Amino acid sequence: MFVGREKELALLRQDYIGKAVMVYGKRRVGKTTLIQKALESHHCPKVYFECLKGTLQDNIDGLVQELVRAQILPVPLQFTALQDVFAYLNTLPQKMVVVVDEYPYLKAMNESATVDSIFQSIIDNRIANIALIISGSHIGMMRETLQEKNALYGRFAATIKLNELSYLDA
């Protein structure tokens, strides 16, 4: 049974095709479970990718593997830029949901401002057929993306901060 997150679940179940959503909060508060539950109601291809503590290329390769596993890509294709992955996905006829979880891992292992700038470009130009959900646990790093000086400022159609459930809600 899924309890205590009805408001957040309803928000995530909305149609965000062509938009980006951010979900953040402390570790172990239910971000991934909430996202997975919301994805059950989306009747389109979906892919869940947990960022690696590695290079951009490691993460590109990992995302491509998940796209193949989700049968969005028929075979692994070679990409050297995240923007190219999303540009390719944007040419596909079907709408889809792409979840990028543990986004701070990507920022911690690569130039943080560059990663945000890459995702700014993706959100602005390469998700017409995609609902993009970015999630993470490093609250400071996730909040940083919401600040006016950040490349991702104003780019999220919805921002969901998950707090721990109270005893009564759980």
Please describe what each predicted stretch is.
Residues 1-170:
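Phosphate-binding site recognition
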